[in-house]
Amino acid sequence: MKKLLLIIFLAFTSTGFCQLKSKSFEEVDSLQYFQKKKIIVFIHTDWCQFCQRMKITTFKNKEIMEKLNSNFYFIDFNAELKRDILFNNQTFKYKPSGNNVGVHELALELGTINNQIVYPVLCVLNDKNEIILQYNNYLSPKDFKLLLEKLEQ
């Protein structure tokens, strides 16, 4: 019985050591002064099924978590967040569009492709906070790893 409990404990703790470290926009603004890195912003909503799927598959992949933690600044951004965000010397606000419905201005700024926003959105910024890539679709762990490899070059 003790061996079984030990095995279960080790199984849970060995996978728990690697966690994806998400930053805020404000943190990244400050961190860029000390170490320049590309910023990967995952723009999602709570109701988006593909967004939730990426959270439990792509962003739980150990290799992906390690690459994101060491080579990039990662921001997990809910497009329906209702607080103001100061980023790149500009304040972005939540824009209500009905009863308990709306979208954050920063999500629109970073996630709009061809005049529309479709979730999930992956937005990559260079170290000067300029958009270098936008992608609005589900990315499997395999495809996301390929993207990270290209971004690391």
Annotate each language-model stretch with its function.
Residues D46-R53, V121-C123:
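C-type cytochrome heme c attachment motif
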Residues F34-Q49:
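Short active-site neighborhood of thiol/selenol oxidoreductases, capturing the structured segment around
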Residues Q52-K67:
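Typically the conserved alpha-helix immediately C-terminal to a functionally engaged Cys/Sec
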Residues M1-K21:
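Bacterial Sec-dependent N-terminal signal peptides
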Residues E63-I64, Y73-V121, L125-I131, L151:
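Thioredoxin-like thiol-disulfide oxidoreductase module
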Residues Q19-Q35:
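N-terminal leader/targeting and pre-domain segments
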